Amino acid sequence: MSKVGTSDSKNTLYCSFCGKSQHEVRKLIAGPTVFICDECVELCMDIIREENKSSLVKSRDGIPTPKEICKVLDDYVIGQSHAKKVLSVAVHNHYKRLNHQTKHNDVELAKSNILLIGPTGSGKTLLAQTLARILDVPFTMADATTLTEAGYVGEDVENIILKLLQAADYNVERAQRGIVYIDEIDKISRKSDNPSITRDVSGEGVQQALLKIMEGTVASVPPQGGRKHPQQEFLQVDTTNILFICGGAFAGLEKIISARGRSTSIGFGAQVLAPEDRRTGEIFRHVEPEDLLKYGLIPEFVGRLPVVATLEDLDETSLKKILTEPKNALVKQYQRLFEMENIELTFADEALGAVARKAIERKTGARGLRSILEAILLETMFDLPGLEGVEEVVISREVVEGTARPLYIYADRSDRAVENASA
C-alpha cells in the first residue's frame, strides 16, 4: 500500500509485505489496494518450489513407490532401466525399513548399500544428482579421490558425514536417515597386490576407514571440521540407517572379467568373453565379487556393497535421445540461449546422429556431448550478437562434420542465408 510521509516523499510507494520503499527494490507490483516487491515475489516462489519438491513422489505412509521414483528418473535420465530399477527399489526399501523398523523388533532389517559400475559418461552421477532433486531426505555427494586416512593431507572419511549433517541443517535425526553417494570409488582401489609394500593412505587405507561408517557406527563429527578446530565439541551421528551408494567407471575391470571368462571356458560349447567384440557395459553384466577383489577392492569393502547395478554403454540412439528428450536436454539448453537473442536454433536429425557418433568415437559417453556442441556452435555464438535480422540457425550433418557452416535464415528471406551456409 502507498504510505504518505513528509511532503517530499508523500508519493513514495512501499511494499505491503516487507515495508521497503520503491527506491529500495528493483520492481514494485501494484494490486487493487496493495503492492509487492520483486524480492517478496522471489521468496514466495522459493516457498512454493520447496513444497512441490517435498510432495513430488509421496504415496501412502509417505513412502515413494519404486515405480514413482523410476518415473521421475525417466524424465531426466535416458536408458539404464536396470540401474534405475535397482536404485528405485533400494531407495524405496530404505524409506520402508526406516518407517517400520520399530514395529517388528523380532526381525532386524539390514540395509543394502549399492555399487554402481558403468563406463564414463553412462549416467552414474546424473542418477545420483536426480535422486537428490526428488527425494525428501538429506543427500550429499562425496569424491573418493579427495579422501585419505585420518592424519594425512586430504579429507577425512568423517567429512562425508559432516556434509550430510550440513545438508540436514545440522539436524542429527534427519541426517541419520539420509543417503550418501560416493563417486569415483574405483580410484581408491589397492595400488599393489602386496599390501605390505608401503602404506596406501589414499587407497586401501580409505577403504578401511569407510568400512565402519558404511556398516553402521556412531561417528564423532566435528561441526566445523576437525583439523582446523580441534577443541570443538563433537556431534554423535549413528550411520546405521544411512544408505551408501558408491559409483565408479572401473576402467580395466572388463579385462579382468574377460580373462576370468576365458580361463573358466572349457569345451567346444563354452562362451568366451572377448572385450574387442563386446561393449564394456555388456561385459560388466558378468561381474563377480572376485573380479572386484582382483581390481583392488578389499574383501570387507566388497561385502558391504551387496547390491551391484551395472550401467551400459550409450549407443547412438540413446545419445540422440539424451540430446533432445530430458527436461534439461542439451539441445533445449542451447535453444534457450538462442531464444535470448530472439533466434530459433534447429538441429537436423542427421546432425544429432553425427554428434552422437562423435561422442562414441571419443569414448566419453554423454559427458562429451556438451563439448562437441560447444565446438560446433562457437563461431555462431560469436557472430550472432552482432548480426541483425537473423531469425533462425539450422545445424546440418555437414556442419557437425566440419564441411559446411551453419545456415542463417534472415527475416527478409534474402540470399544472405545461402551465402552463410557456404563453407
UniProtKB/Swiss-Prot annotation:
Keyword match Zinc: yes
Protein name: ATP-dependent Clp protease ATP-binding subunit ClpX
Family, as annotated: Belongs to the ClpX chaperone family.
Record-listed Zn(2+) binding positions: C15, C18, C37, C40
Binding positions for ATP per the UniProt entry: P119, T120, G121, S122, G123, K124, T125, L126
UniProt cross-references to NCBIfam families, sorted A to Z: clpX, PRK05342.1
InterPro entries: AAA+_ATPase, ATP-dep_Clp_protease_ClpX, ATPase_AAA_core, Clp_ATPase_C, Clp_protease_ATP-bd_su_ClpX, ClpX_bact, P-loop_NTPase, Znf_CppX_C4
S-S bridge residues: none
